[in-house]
Amino acid sequence: MKIFATIIIFLAGIYGSLSAQTLHGTVVTSDGEAVRLANVAILNPTDSTYIAGTITHDNGTFSIAADSKNLIKVWCTGFMPYLGKVANANMRIVLSPDTIMLGEVEVKAAKPLSRIEGDAIVTNIRGTILQNIGTAKDVLGYLPGIISVQGGIEVLGKGAPTFYINGRKMRSYTELDMLKSNKIKKVELVTNPGARYDSSVNAVIRISADRDPGEGFAIDNTARLGYRDFVYGGDDLSLNYRTGKLDVFSNLKYGYNKSKGHSTNVQNSWLQSSYRQEIGLESEGKSQIYDAQLGADYTISNTSSTGVYYKLTCQPSDKNNVYTGNIYIDNILNESSLIDQGSNTHLTSHTVDGYYTAIFGKWTFDAAFDLLWKYSDDDILSNELINNTDKLRLNTESNVDSRMFAAEAHASHPWLKGNFSFGAEYIDSRRNDDFFNPEHLLNDNQLVLDERNAGIYAQTAQRLGKVTLQLGLRYEHIESRYHEFGKFIPEQSKTYNKVLPSVTLVLPIGKNMLQLSYSRKYKRPLYSQLSSSIYYVNRYLYQSGNPLLKSEYSHNISANYRFGQFMIMANYGLTDDKIISEISQYGDNSNITLLRKENSTHDLHELQAFVTYMPQFGNYFSVLTAGIMAQFYKIDYCGNIRNMNNPIGMVQWKNIVALPRNLKLEASLTWRTCGEAENIDMGHTWSINAGITKVFNRHWQAKISVNDIFNTARKSYNTIYSDYRDIYLEKYVNTRGVECSVRYMFNTTKSKYKGKGAGNNEKPRL
């Protein structure tokens, strides 16, 4: 706590030295959206020579010494520059976009404009061909540095990002489906997040969307129906009622999915004898999701608001697996088996989120809290027949009960030629993990993991001539306490104290922009990865956590360069104690393989480089991304060192054609070569998708899409190497499907809810 006190005193000293400013102002767009990191210059009225300058901070405000006779010039990429006289009172400066809009007529041929701005790659969506493409998820797949992967979104070379919508942390991917593209103003991609974000965050996507209050009742409903082996579908319903300063909102979602597949698993072990296990799997399962959210937002004044919401999510699922297995010892058949396994899983979560945001003079302040309760139970029943004679019946039950409280607060203030911000975050979480096996073939377990996480940060962004420099420092203190059957286990309990710096530099090169950044990160294991419970996958494969896992640490250097219609992105990372999948023998039984996580004994070096080309020809818009992901890594395998250095190539080509009668045609190609990632050798894959969208009027929209037209992505295969074993997995799942969606809108605007949430990176760990 002495470090906390020292930093707080340091921050107070800085702000005690802030001098008063003569001119205060706010820079906004024509939609009222704050313009961050806009250039502000005070000019001599006689010859327009430069006198002083600064940049706006996150809420668009600025302060600068100026005389009433001076001129003020404000400009930012993507907007028309502003030039006028200095006002004596607070100034409100409105920047007009350089995309031409004629009344209610959409400029459908306008190209999304991507630019480097501060710590982010910013892409305007409003007024472009992407405006009516569908949902936020559809939009993101067309942006530089972002790809669509199996229904999710990833940042190239960074994995799954953390999402913010109007400053509020996104809780699940369903929110991307519920946010429609015509509500999005711009998207910001941060490829190397600074001190403001949790140290485990590798990339951030910030989405700015409409939040005009409007009046009265509004409805936005999208129904989906598709076929992929089986019929699947769902419905998303958003309701709003707005009156005066009050906004009451509700979101309801239902989804149903059913799927099947088969796979082949070959396990090789080289011990005193050579073991080979060949396992076939036929699986079929169904899942549902029920999601309900109710909340309210109240605008206290033009500069402050508060809100709260409650969310309930239920996800039941059932699955049936049939395994056929053969075990060979020194190439002689030793055992055959047939396993019929059924599983039933229920997951329920309750979330309460609240926020408060305000501007006091030159200060911007926001605070948030989160309460999360999460329950899951997983029951598995296996009936096994060994060598056509021996029968075995096995039941397992796993119950996980998690809860979390989190709170955070942030403040920012103009300082020198930029701004200064600082904040604090506190998280208190607990996970109870109980595992039972009535037949006592596996050990029962009762685990409790308590964790306290406190963090503070300070960050400043300054304009140094034409260069923007952002410096940040974050300190985190974490205490983790591990209990098994009510007994405290000190060797599995950990305490961390970490100081994590970050630097971002943005500078022009001619008419182009270059962004360079460095950050130090660390990633804690998931709670499930720290569990010592043994989970029964099948007769030959068990899975468990590892309570001795350490956090992994990494150094990241990123470079982004934009010129013309091209965006070049590169990243280098060095990771210590990388958490990887390891396979080993379970106890004294060489027929059973245990899969769990371990810290690698070798450092992992990773290099990624991508080029995105975004041309437009009339009503045709295309995004072509090509790149390579390479690693320099080695593992211990069969008593030798195996190099895992084969790079992976990737190409994604997305196309949109705007047709007459409000039609849009889409087509995309995704291709990935074989290569190696960590200790896994991955196979190649490719697919082609297509779709057509029709807007009937301002209330109705329909879309038909076909995923993986040639069903080429149905096969996936990879090999895991570890110690004296390897596992080859070949999986077939039908990825070809057709889907139709219909959307109805009435008096729709985005909810005004501005909460960011707290403990956002602790939730997925639970």
What are the functions of these language-model segments?
Residues 41-43, 75-79, 90-129, 149-150, ...:
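Short, acidic, small-residue-rich periplasmic hinge/interaction motif at the N-terminus
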Residues 46-61:
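Short, acidic Ser/Thr/Gly-rich low-complexity loop/linker segments typical of extracellular
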Residues 89-94, 104, 136-139, 173-174, ...:
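N-terminal periplasmic accessory domains that precede
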Residues 142, 168-194:
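Short acidic/polar hinge/loop motifs at secondary-structure boundaries
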Residues 208-223, 262, 266, 290-292, ...:
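Surface-exposed extracellular loop regions of Gram-negative outer-membrane beta-barrel proteins
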Residues 291-317, 339-484, 508, 512-513, ...:
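Face-selective signature of the C-terminal outer-membrane beta-barrel domain
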Residues 404-408, 453-456, 544, 550, ...:
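Outer membrane beta-barrel strand-and-loop segments of large Gram-negative receptors
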Residues 448-451, 491-494, 522-576, 595-607, ...:
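Outer-membrane beta-barrel signature, preferentially recognizing the C-terminal barrel domain
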